Amino acid sequence: MKSSKLRAGAVLACTLALTACGGGDDGQLAIGGSFSGVTKTGLVLTNNGGSDYAVVPTTSGVGNWFFPNLVETDSKYNVEVKSKPDNVETCQVIAPTGRAVFATNRVDVACTFKKHDLGGSVANLKGELVLVNGADKVTIPAGATSFAMAKVPQDGVYGIAILTQPAGQTCTIANASGTMGAAAINNVAVTCTP
């Protein structure tokens, strides 16, 4: 008798726990996940061609999202990208399809920023010059008239600095810092004297 009461209590506890997690018979299950690479508005996700959701961007570009419309228990979901921010090249949905048995928070969306060239001109360089932009380091040989750094994500900041001056010369940089727009930056100017 005592063990049957314990079993009944355990079943009740499990049922209540499942209902609280979205696993009950009411079918009110949330579909969502995480996102990365979203710093601007424009990412819209859709489930089965409807139930659109505009992801709210974050400064860091990462966060979580959930469709506001809940789905029925055992229904199929198919998450797709309807539109993407203008500073993004592509957005990939990871684990986009499934069947809603419990609330789902594992439909992740990974967006890749557009990247653009960063470079410019060099004047009167007689020795070797080393430039840096964050972790990117470029060695420019004597006599060079131009240079290129690693591509920078759109809307990302850049700041080119001189790490090593050429022997016997002093070089300065014009237009060394800014924010990458929708096109390449090629007006950075390095001038060396004498």
PLM regions and their residue ranges:
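Bacterial N-terminal signal peptides that target proteins for export
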Residues: 1-10
